[in-house]
């Protein structure tokens, strides 16, 4: 029996349950084990809690032998590799885009200036401000139902959350607008899961690898390489989206390319620096590093140092 560690929220157990069911369908008995993390116990702003707030307890459970593997939202994993663990599988990604849930079925452009929009993410807050719509950004914590209720109760005019989370909980009917990357670049690895186990557990790693999706792994690798190079940690205002696309060469042969778009935004929305590049899935990390280098050339370091030292970066 493969014991799979998961956070206790409905979203987390739904995500991990999908991994469990996929393993069972392939003939590998599996069960979920709920682990409480520091991020679940705290009601403070996510970025004040530190990197790894949702993952450390799950990793400890693996190391102590209480579980065999753990399912993380990939974007919650620290960008620095931990040699004790291996990401044995990155399953096929859900929709990586951000989504708006607004009162009266409105889209962002229809909300009047001064409308209250909730988000838990400095990245979303910065890009929302950069749209120049005059929206008032408010911090947002709690599970997805709690967040949605803040709109239905009239406490907020809208919230911006990951579309993937809404999809996994069957709440896509609440979405009033899906934000295209040209409006808002998602968080690196948004919509993707990471299935992690002990680095030396080659037998389990081989079983988990049956769930791996090569295109998703390439995309996530490029996005997280960009994030790591920017030394941003998971709460900095960095967006990135990569995808594997088919192209045709001069001889009419189809081949795969990996495209990557990245941005760094000032928290006040006054500036957004964007860069993009194209590479191959087999050199995903190199693509991430090259787009990060272009962002640095365009002034990302100066923009991010301002974000790091801003005492008011609570949302």
Swiss-Prot record:
Residues annotated with S-(dipyrrolylmethanemethyl)cysteine modification: 234
GO BP field: protoporphyrinogen IX biosynthetic process
Free-text remark on how the cofactor is bound: Binds 1 dipyrromethane group covalently.
Required cofactor names: dipyrromethane
Keywords for this protein: Porphyrin biosynthesis, Transferase
Pathway: Porphyrin-containing compound metabolism; protoporphyrin-IX biosynthesis; coproporphyrinogen-III from 5-aminolevulinate: step 2/4
Top-level taxon in the UniProt lineage: Bacteria
GO molecular function: hydroxymethylbilane synthase activity
Catalytic activity annotation: 4 porphobilinogen + H2O = hydroxymethylbilane + 4 NH4(+)
Gene Ontology, cellular component aspect: cytoplasm
EC number: 2.5.1.61
Function of the protein: Tetrapolymerization of the monopyrrole PBG into the hydroxymethylbilane pre-uroporphyrinogen in several discrete steps.
Subunit-structure text: Monomer.
Similarity comment: family membership: Belongs to the HMBS family.
Note in the entry: The porphobilinogen subunits are added to the dipyrromethane group.
UniProt-recorded name of the protein: Porphobilinogen deaminase
Protein species of origin: Mycobacterium avium (strain 104)
Taxonomic classification: Bacteria, Bacillati, Actinomycetota, Actinomycetes, Mycobacteriales
